[in-house]
A protein has these predicted regions:
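Inter-domain helical "communication" segments and dimerization helices
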Residues: 1-4, 105-113
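A cross-family signal for key residues in well-ordered alpha-helices
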Residues: 52, 103-104
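C-terminal structural segments of small proteins and small subunits
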Residues: 81-103
Length: 113
């Protein structure tokens, strides 16, 4: 991934965020909430698709229509429940249609055999 940071903009301010500190993005209509590894949350005036494009070819994967996660923060995958637990303890849904692609992403990054 060539991008090392993102400029997150909302109606009040713009903030430069190290992309490695982003745990996940969650869609909120035409806005997006970004959760960082220090547990801070930032609301951005861009939609989830915009962030998906900006983080393509990196460690991010769209696991559900509402969630884009940093796979480096995955600690547990609940196979039969279609859920993923992140290092913060937050459990994120895994779309049935994305499960195989998710495993392939983890494999391609060398995170699993």
């Amino acid at each position: 991934m060539t991008t090392k940071s993102l400029i997150i903009t909302n109606s009040r301010y713009s903030e430069i965020v190290d992309i490695k500190s982003i745990v996940f993005f969650i869609a909120n209509g035409s806005y997006c909430e970004i959760v960082l590894n220090d547990k801070r949350k930032i609301t951005a005036s861009k939609n989830l698709h915009w962030f998906e494009e900006k983080t393509a070819n990196g460690f991010f994967f769209r696991v559900h229509k509402s969630y884009l996660i940093n796979v480096l923060f995955v600690t547990k995958i609940f196979n039969n429940e279609f859920k993923i637990e992140l290092s913060s303890g937050i459990v994120i849904p895994l779309s049935r249609s994305k499960k195989l692609d998710f495993w392939q992403k983890l494999t391609s990054l060398g995170l699993i055999d």
